[in-house]
Amino acid sequence: MPIAQDQLATLRSFGYTEVESRFLYLVATHSGYFTVRQFLDFANAKSGKRNAHLIAKLFSQGHATAQRYRRRSCVYHLHSRALYDAIGKGELRNRRNHEIRHITARLLALDYILAHSENEYFETARAKWRYLVETLKVPDDIFLPEADGTEWIALPDRFPMGVSRASARSAPAVIFTYVDSEHFGLGPFIRHLRMNRRLYAALPYFEFVYVSTASREQEEAAEIFALLIQGRGLEDLLRYFDLKTKWDNRQYGLLSEDEVIFLSEGRKRYTGEIFAALYYLWKRNQLPKDLRAEGFCNSNCAFKLMTVCGHDAVFGTEIKRWGDGWKVRGSSRANSPPRSPRLEQQVLPTKANA
C-alpha cells in the first residue's frame, strides 16, 4: 500500500524506524489497535528486541496505551492526538477508546490489511463514497433510503474497502470486505448484504472477501452470497427443498436414484440455521422476495473466503480484562475492580425477512 513519504518522514522524526513507521501508519489509519504478533508478522521478525524497542518508544512518548486481557498478552492502542495530527489524521476516531466488540473487529480488519498490503485501501467513509461515485460512476442517489423502507447503504470503517491494481482485468477491481468477528450466526451478514445489494448491482465488477476466524460458517456464507448477490443457486435450493419434503413425507417412490444422490449432497451443502429457516418459509410459500434472480443481482463479481488466526491468545475464549473480578485481601466484593463489558450474544432469527 503506497504511503506518502512526508507522512513516513514525520513518523521517523519521532524516532521510529522505517518499518515501524509504516506499521504505525497502517494501524493509526485502519485500526487504532494492534498486537505484538501483528507487528512481528509485518516486520518478519521474532519476538525480542524489535517489539520491545517499539513498545518502549510508544510509551516514552505517550503515543500508546496497553490493555491486558490475559496474563502475558496485551492489546496496544494508538491514542495520541499528536501522532494522528502528525500524519494528517487527527479527525479519525481510531484514537478514541472503544468497547471490546469494536477492538476485536478492528484487529481482524488489520489482519486482513497486513496480509494484503499490496492493495490500496480507503481511509474514510467519505473517500470510499467519492471513489464509488466519481470514479466508478455509481449514482449518488443510490446511497439514499428508498420509499419501501430500504436501509441506508453504509460504508462502515470496520470493513476495509480497497482497490486491487494487480487484477488481471483491464481496470482496477474494487474490493469489499465483511469482517465476522463475533460468530453469532449469519444474521448480521445477511442484513449487510441486503442493505448493500443496490450498490453491488450498480458496479461493473467487484470482489467481496468474507474474513473470519471460524471456517464452519464460511461455506454457508458463500451460499448466501450466491443467492442474494449473484442471483444463482436458487434453482438448486428449491429442488433440494422439494426433494426433502418428499423424503420427509416418506414418498420414496417419487424419488429417482439421481434425486436421492442430489438430496444426500444437499444435506451436506445446505447446513446451518438459515437454510432451516428458508425451508420453513418455503413450505408456507413465504420465501423472501430478494431471493428472486430478477432482483438486484450482479453475477460479475468474485466471492472469496479468508481465514485469519484471530486473537484468542490475547483475549482467550472468554473476553475480559486480566484481573477482572479479583478480590483484594480484606475487602468486600463491592470494592473489587469493575468487571469489563462482555459481548452481548445475538440470536439468529428463525425466520428470514419476507
Role assignments for model-derived ranges:
Residues 1-87:
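Basic, Lys/Arg-rich alpha-helical nucleic-acid-recognition elements, primarily the DNA-binding modules
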Residues 27, 43, 55-59, 112-120, ...:
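Hydrophobic, Leu/Ile/Phe/Ala-enriched alpha-helical segments that form helix-helix packing faces
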Residues 33-35, 85-93, 169-177, 206-207:
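Glycine-rich, often proline-containing surface loops adjacent to acidic residues and nearby aromatics
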Residues 63, 91-92, 128-145, 195-203, ...:
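Short flexible/disordered coil segments
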Residues 77, 123-125, 208-211:
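A structural signal for short, well-ordered beta-strand segments and their strand-loop junctions
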Residues 80-107:
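Short, amphipathic alpha-helical interaction segments positioned at domain boundaries
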Residues 97-188:
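Exposed, interaction-prone assembly regions rather than primary DNA-binding/catalytic cores
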Residues 170-354:
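C-terminal regulatory/effector modules of DNA-binding transcriptional regulators
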